[in-house]
Amino acid sequence: MTEELNGRRIVVPEARELGQLVRMLEERGAEAIPCPMIAIRDAPDAEPVAAWLRWFVKGTCDDLVLMTGEGLRRLLGLALRTDLEPAFLDALRTTRKITRGPKPVRALREIGLDADIPADEPTTDGIITAMRRHDLSGRSVGVQLNPGNPNRRLVDFIEAAGAVPYPVLPYVYVSEADDARVLAIISDMAAGQFDAIAFTSAPQARRLRDVARATGRDADLLQGFRRIVVAAVGRSSRQSLKRLACK
């Protein structure tokens, strides 16, 4: 691994764990080029999330669908700031927890809890498949949503199963690096100035695409993808890149 990365120039679009990824690559001899595409922020209007927390701590939530580890951590953070953390943790312990993929499982373990129903695969379809095995009739189901995805398919499934969904969106994505920096990365990719780019989330790829489209640089972006190695962590990242014509 060290020999494979020695001297390689690798673009890192990550924001939250940027320092860790840069150190990991540099320890293996690579030159990491940071360009954080997306930052994660608490929902700008905290009141709907706080209202959801007040409902949740009443203990009337039967099931909680956790799409991401970040979602649980953001809920915990707001619970702490609103003096609801003990009640929130108590309610979590007695609520059946349904998780999509390893990240929400990891976030639960950080607070000494486990998933009760892990999805068959880390997708909405995987969650629905897992939930079909259980009678949901009459149950109250909290649903932690992802930014930009109201997930009507999951919400509709829950309603069709006779349950009542209670969605919550605890965080949002915002642009991090300015457009000029992103455009410079696109130009250098097209020119073959890098060896690889490593995506850790779908929103990173979408930001790159959006900047390219807005500036008429789609062809440069596709050329860049074809000239360098494109790495993706996680299924959603891979799917986003496939839609951008990456193999």
Language-model regions, residue ranges each:
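Signature of uroporphyrinogen-III synthase
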Residues: 1-247
